[in-house]
Amino acid sequence: STPKLCLVNFMQLILFCYLTGNNDMHLKNFSLYAPKSNYMLTPAYDLLNVAIVNPKDKEELALTLNGKKSRLQKRDFVVAAQKMGIDEKAIDKMIISFNRIMPKWNSWINSSFLSDELKQKYMDLITQRMKYLMGE
């Protein structure tokens, strides 16, 4: 894996955490390993929606993004990505890709063991945050 690809994967993970309400992705949830000579981002873990079970926590991410943890907009993700050497076009593609699978997310959430109330809160959260990222 190339360093650039690892950065793209890292940015996708940040977007995923934002979209799914995972505001608990602190530094202990990210790590690197070197299977050969190059360091790589480890597979993601601890990916859960904390926002729906702890609505008093108004932070949208555990770590700051573009100097913010809440009231994030697409521009914040673009600026952060550009600082990592990822252009805006790549961020747009990531957002479009996540938007395309919204029906799958809806299906997975509806078939989960969450209560009907939490299922609705989960989908509402993802839908609202996707609108922010799509600029709506």
Protein language model annotation of sequence segments:
Residues 1-136:
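Anionic ligand-binding catalytic core segments
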